[in-house]
């Protein structure tokens, strides 16, 4: 499994609907980039200027909303993940 460093987290994106409410199938080019995901791994935390380590607020299993163009997409063992910094997380769902 991938292990993020520092204040980074790894998420699996929750894909958006392929149909509209009225039943129209959307092509890939018309879909918005997903902004929801499930946290699958978290780093050890960020280090402050004075050397203290601050634990992350998100934890494995959290569902989150993140900034639209945040993170780096990676593919590992056939699964696509997004690696982003905790500061790119806008909210924890639930």
UniProtKB/Swiss-Prot annotation:
The record's SUPFAM superfamilies line, in alphabetical order, gives: GroES-like
> Is Transcription regulation one of the keywords?
no
Q: Does the keyword DNA-binding apply?
A: no
Where in the cell is the protein located?
Cytoplasm
UniProt keyword annotations, A-Z:
Chaperone, Cytoplasm
Q: Which GO terms describe its cellular component?
A: cytoplasm
One BP term from GO: chaperone cofactor-dependent protein refolding
Gene3D superfamilies referenced in this protein's UniProt entry, alphabetically: GroES chaperonin (2.30.33.40)
Principal subcellular localization: cytoplasm
Q: Which GO terms describe its molecular function?
A: ATP binding; metal ion binding; protein folding chaperone; protein-folding chaperone binding; unfolded protein binding
Per the entry, what this protein does is:
Together with the chaperonin GroEL, plays an essential role in assisting protein folding. The GroEL-GroES system forms a nano-cage that allows encapsulation of the non-native substrate proteins and provides a physical environment optimized to promote and accelerate protein folding. GroES binds to the apical surface of the GroEL ring, thereby capping the opening of the GroEL channel.
Annotated family: Belongs to the GroES chaperonin family.
Q: Quaternary form?
A: Heptamer of 7 subunits arranged in a ring. Interacts with the chaperonin GroEL.
Q: What is this protein called?
A: Co-chaperonin GroES
- From which organism does this entry originate? Shouchella clausii (strain KSM-K16) (Alkalihalobacillus clausii)
